[in-house]
Amino acid sequence: MAASALRGLPVAGGGESSESEDDGWEIGYLDRTSQKLKGLLPIEEKKEKFKKAMTIGDVSLVQELLDSGISVDSTFQYGWTPLMYAASVANAELVRVLLDRGANASFEKDKQSILITACSAHGSEEQILKCVELLLSRNADPNVACRRLMTPIMYAARDGHTQVVALLVAHGAEVNTQDENGYTALTWAARQGHKNIVLKLLELGANKMLQTKDGKMPSEIAKRNKHHEIFNLLSFTLNPLEGKLQQLTKEDTICKILTTDSDREKDHIFSSYTAFGDLEVFLHGLGLEHMTDILKERDITLRHLLTMREDEFTKNGITSKDQQKILAALKELQVEEIQFGELSEETKLEISGDEFLNFLLKLNKQCGHLITAVQNVITELPVNSQKITLEWASPQNFTSVCEELVNNVEDLSEKVCKLKDLIQKLQNERESDPTHIQLREEVSTWNSRILKRTAITICGFGFLLFICKLTFQRK
């Protein structure tokens, strides 16, 4: 029974199989009847017991066998050492014991280091973090790459271990190293959708402009894998956190990146950090940290902030000076928008929510520009025909064009109202669908607000054109 329960444990050597019954890591029942091992067992039998003790994680028996003369750096089948196996299963207690007995933390087998093995281990991040800390404390090199030129930080970023990434960088790991395909740690994090790691790597100086072998940047990799939030984050031309911690000493960097979580063991410290959200990243980059608490209290998201009007800025207590900083930053925002000419007459069913929202935002923005332009013309238009110094064509031509504009605006208003009704219908159907997972309320509320603004803007534009038409008729 015990033997069958233990057969599912990982096998050293990356899961390789062997037809031999003696594969070096056989899992079975361990006879503990004789604990007086010094000098009583042949060396081969001691090695066999040592392998089994390692496999089941029996720390006390491992220590006893080491005391009996077993080498701490003995190699088994596949050439793995006990320390490499302990790291592969994220057994921090075994790793500590073996290191204390003098195990080589810099051992490599087939271009795979023990540190890489720990970073790619199957286990909780807490246990992996412990193992990595122990190995780094024994001078394991965080920049040694495997055969695919992947370094430990790439494995940690790929597997979503945020604290491990931070710890590796604090001990000198290169952030912008590229593997055989041109992937960096940032590219791996973007590919797998690990937003917190993306934010931390940006803070640590990751270069988001580095391209893969096929010419893709991390933002494009994120978009290709449908991680739209990370795509938008990486699309900022301005990287507000880039290089923020690069000039600090190793000790200062550790203090900045890591804060003590708890001392659950007497002589070991766990580490954690609080990641910036999108809103914090944006505000810190502009030197507007003082606005963070105010905006969070009012449940204002980054997307909401970036689409605010002047009256909303004032209403939410944002000063004119801060408004100018935000508006200037908007010009630096490279959000991929749908061009009007790119839309075919057929509905693009594959359009994403972010792309559709960008379309509505751009439509609303263009309508706002048109309203401003017409208002400027109305303001500058002479109220008396005698003040017109240049030769004009018949006013009838102008009023005719204005009538067409009014008709077009009315048609546009009708279409937008239909679009709003259609979206509302879809929303109602999704809410009534028992299999649908409800999205956050702020998202749907904000989309509805955008549609309302667009409709109001178009109606206002039509009203201005109507006034313009009356002005020409009066003249």
UniProtKB/Swiss-Prot annotation:
Q: Name one GO biological process term.
A: cell differentiation
Ranges of the ANK repeats in the UniProt entry: 45-74, 78-107, 110-144, 148-177, 181-210, 214-243
Looking at the record, which segments are called Disordered? 1-25
Q: Does the keyword Lyase apply?
A: no
Q: Which UniProt keywords apply?
A: ANK repeat, Cytoplasm, Developmental protein, Differentiation, Meiosis, Phosphoprotein, Repeat, RNA-mediated gene silencing, Spermatogenesis
The record's section on SMART domains has: ANK (SM00248)
Under the heading InterPro entries, the entry gives: Ankyrin_rpt (IPR002110), Ankyrin_rpt-contain_sf (IPR036770), Asz1_SAM (IPR042650), SAM (IPR001660), SAM/pointed_sf (IPR013761)
Phosphoserine is found on S17, S18, S20
Domain SAM residue range list: 272-334
Localization recorded for this chain is: Cytoplasm
What is the superkingdom listed in this entry's lineage?
Eukaryota
Q: GO CC annotations?
A: pi-body
Key word Protease present in the record? no
- One Pfam match: Ank
Principal place of residence: cytoplasm
Q: Please give the SUPFAM superfamilies that the UniProt record associates with this protein.
A: Ankyrin repeat (SSF48403), Pseudo ankyrin repeat-like (SSF140860), SAM/Pointed domain (SSF47769)
Task: Briefly state the protein's biological role.
Answer: Plays a central role during spermatogenesis by repressing transposable elements and preventing their mobilization, which is essential for the germline integrity. Acts via the piRNA metabolic process, which mediates the repression of transposable elements during meiosis by forming complexes composed of piRNAs and Piwi proteins and governs the methylation and subsequent repression of transposons. Its association with pi-bodies suggests a participation in the primary piRNAs metabolic process.
- How does it associate, per the subunit comment? Interacts with DDX4, PIWIL1, RANBP9 and TDRD1.
> What protein name is recorded for this chain?
Ankyrin repeat, SAM and basic leucine zipper domain-containing protein 1
